[in-house]
Amino acid sequence: NYIAYEALAGRKGAVGVYNYETGEVLCMVSTPAFDPLNPPSAEELEENDAYEGAYLNRFLSGTFTPGSVYKTVTLAAAIENVPDLYDRTWTCTGSTTVGDGAVTCPYAHGEQDIYAALSNSCNGVFALLADELGEDVLARYTEKAGLTASYSVNGIRTAAGSFDLDGLTANELGWAGVGQYNDLVNPCALMVYMG
């Protein structure tokens, strides 16, 4: 726990490590935090922003935007629903039009197949795939991945993830397919999914 706490270096966040074979949680850290043997006064808690959320266990109760990890959900859906996926190539210029707007990448990846798109974490390719797959398919794979589930950790229920994909525009669905837009996932659920 100490190494995880130090790695967070005062930033707000959570770290969890578990044995994927047994489900045993080996490490669970949430910051900000304080020494329970020397707690801050009520006045310090109120006046010092460093303690904001100190009573919240972000690993259990928090939800966060998953970011590019969610591309693995979009990829799983595409593998099973896009028959010519492995024969396609895309050209990333750093900005891809999806619906009525742009989905941007920090780099222009050039021409790439699905392997390169995953390796490069190309927002444009995964946004196009998300749009092609549609709301229902992405919602089904998100649920299959367990990202909307609440898990029990020693009898304490985690927050459930939230992926409201109904009625999105093509551009919004594209951003959701790369783990942005209004996607929210609990760190424990993400840990279980990736394990």
In which residue ranges do the predicted regions lie?
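Beta-lactam-recognizing serine transpeptidase/beta-lactamase-like catalytic domain environment
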Residues: 20-68, 73-195
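Conserved, well-ordered alpha-helix/loop/beta-strand core segments that scaffold catalytic motifs
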Residues: 1-14
